[in-house]
């Protein structure tokens, strides 16, 4: 608890065309760079570096690189605030880089390279494209991931975070990229069907059934959730 500081707050206004205006108050998050990874007896196996105070994100990159801890890098909404060297430092040693098509174009421009060259900097990159699905680039291989079909589009806020959560679940389980990407796609689908970023729920059985409806049967899911 940071005495005297309020909790970080984000307010996102979305119109009927899914255009968004975001107002953000960092509050206590501005002190996040003072935190350190727990390395004494609780060393993490994998770290997700997602939008945070930019100084904290840079500090996490250094800690992961110094301690040989693999990490996923997702600058997301902080990409506009970061410069090219900062973004490149985060990308260089990342196990995976994830972002939407707009963010990838911005990162490439700031770093001073093409998007194709950016895919070569990191061995595994994931570009999300909203309703058009996603593209995964892994060591020269390209996987096109279709978008899962939502029952209703209530609010797109939080879809990227949900996609990342599904992707990390499949990635850390060692599943093939086509399956991992589809898990991520379906996870994002649940998020956009609800107002609020964490209001969705599903059971393992429901998830597997809906995966089959969208993409066909996948025996690896039974092993993952078994």
Spans of model-derived segments:
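Conserved N-terminal subdomain of the carbohydrate kinase-like
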Residues: 1-46, 208-226
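Conserved phosphate-binding/catalytic region of the ribokinase-like
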Residues: 111-226
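Short, acidic/turn-prone active-site loops that include or flank metal/cofactor-
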Residues: 3-4, 26-29, 75-79, 102-103, ...
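Short, hinge-like loop/turn segments at secondary-structure boundaries
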Residues: 14-19, 66, 89-92, 114-117, ...
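Short beta->alpha linker loops
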Residues: 3-6, 52, 102, 129, ...
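Conserved beta-alpha-beta core of the PfkB/ribokinase-like small-molecule kinase fold
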Residues: 46-116, 124, 132-134
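Short loop segments at secondary-structure junctions
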Residues: 16-19, 27-29, 102, 110, ...
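Short alpha-helical
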Residues: 6, 55-56, 152
């Amino acid at each position: 608890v940071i005495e005297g500081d309020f909790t970080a707050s984000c307010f996102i206004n979305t119109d009927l065309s899914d255009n968004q205006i975001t107002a953000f108050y960092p509050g206590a998050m501005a002190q996040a760079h003072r935190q350190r990874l727990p390395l004494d007896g609780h060393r993490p196996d994998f770290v997700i570096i997602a939008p945070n105070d930019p100084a904290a994100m840079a500090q996490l990159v250094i800690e992961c690189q110094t301690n040989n801890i693999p990490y996923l890098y997702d600058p997301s909404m902080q990409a506009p605030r970061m410069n090219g060297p900062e973004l490149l430092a985060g990308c260089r040693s990342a196990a995976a880089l994830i972002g939407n098509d707009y963010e990838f174009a911005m990162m490439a421009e700031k770093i001073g390279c093409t998007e194709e060259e950016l895919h070569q900097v990191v061995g595994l990159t994931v570009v999300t494209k909203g309703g058009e699905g996603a593209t995964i680039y892994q060591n020269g291989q390209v996987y096109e991931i279709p978008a899962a079909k939502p029952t209703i589009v209530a609010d797109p806020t939080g879809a990227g975070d949900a996609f990342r959560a599904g992707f990390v679940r499949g990635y850390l389980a060692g599943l093939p990229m086509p399956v991992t990407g589809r898990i991520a796609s379906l996870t994002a689908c649940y998020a956009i069907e609800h107002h609020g970023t964490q209001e969705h729920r599903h059971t393992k059985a429901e998830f597997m059934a809906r995966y089959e409806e969208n993409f066909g049967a996948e025996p690896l899911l039974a092993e993952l959730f078994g």
